[in-house]
Amino acid sequence: MQVDLLSSAQSAHALHLFHKHSPLVHCMTNDVVQTFTANTLLALGASPAMVIETEEASQFAAIASALLINVGTLTQPRAQAMSAAVEQATRSQTPWTLDPVAVGALDYRRRFCVELLSHKPTAIRGNASEIMALAGVANGGRGVDTTDAAANAIPAAQTLARETGAIVVVTGEVDYVTDGHRIVGIHGGDPLMTKVVGTGCALSAVVAACCALPGDTLENIASACHWMKQAGERAVARSEGPGSFVPHFLDALWQLTQEVQA
């Protein structure tokens, strides 16, 4: 199994495209992470919108550059709104990304996410346990936490990518991005990133935005993982713990965009 690495030049090119196109991202995400997700997108140069009412969600999915479905705080009314948005995104050819939060631990959201797969997401982003559960390989995970190493989920990610046509991202100490054939590994980041709520969910929003960019979608998505890990490393070097990490992280994302424009 060959795992390719992303070059700095590829990452910088993708970030230049990101800043140039400034995708409008329709984030149907969980209640815990909305502000952090929006600020992450803004720091990188995208435009976030959190539209959740069923009628509006369907309408906005046709307007947005990309759609994110994150099931972290799933309810039946929210599931209805998400389904409507995904159906409209499919009709409008709006790329959409699925973040199957805790899908391995809870039956209702697992069934819902499996139903959504029939609408062919452009990308799927989850931890190892979530990706393996969604692929039907195993049930597991401790709520939103993974109990598996990311590398162990590569075969499941490849299967899921081939079955759905999505680019699948497995995040962990090393992130892996695959279209079912190619695999790109992204190293970096810091364990402190797991002590802040929302870093993975925010990454999913950035992945969604990258699906709207021209060029090689797999490389663009792998670049999103690289930016987040880079920013995490810079933020950890300047912070004293989780509380001071967040503002330094947002600053680091912003600085990355300024560097590629220089």
From Swiss-Prot:
The UniProt annotation places substrate binding at M50, G198
Record Pfam families: HK (PF02110)
The record's keywords, sorted A to Z, are:
ATP-binding, Kinase, Magnesium, Metal-binding, Nucleotide-binding, Thiamine biosynthesis, Transferase
Q: What is the similarity comment for this entry? A: Belongs to the Thz kinase family.
Q: Which reaction does it catalyse?
A: 5-(2-hydroxyethyl)-4-methylthiazole + ATP = 4-methyl-5-(2-phosphooxyethyl)-thiazole + ADP + H(+)
Q: Name one GO molecular function term.
A: hydroxyethylthiazole kinase activity
Q: What class of enzyme is it?
A: transferase
What cofactor(s) does the depicted protein rely on?
Answer: Mg(2+)
- According to its UniProt record, in which pathway does this protein act? Cofactor biosynthesis; thiamine diphosphate biosynthesis; 4-methyl-5-(2-phosphoethyl)-thiazole from 5-(2-hydroxyethyl)-4-methylthiazole: step 1/1
Stated role? Catalyzes the phosphorylation of the hydroxyl group of 4-methyl-5-beta-hydroxyethylthiazole (THZ).
UniProt-recorded name of the protein = Hydroxyethylthiazole kinase
Check the UniProt entry and state the signal peptide residues, or none: none
In terms of InterPro entries, this protein maps to: Hyethyz_kinase, Ribokinase-like
Binding site residues for ATP: R125, T171
Q: Which gene does this sequence derive from? A: thiM
Q: Which EC number applies?
A: 2.7.1.50
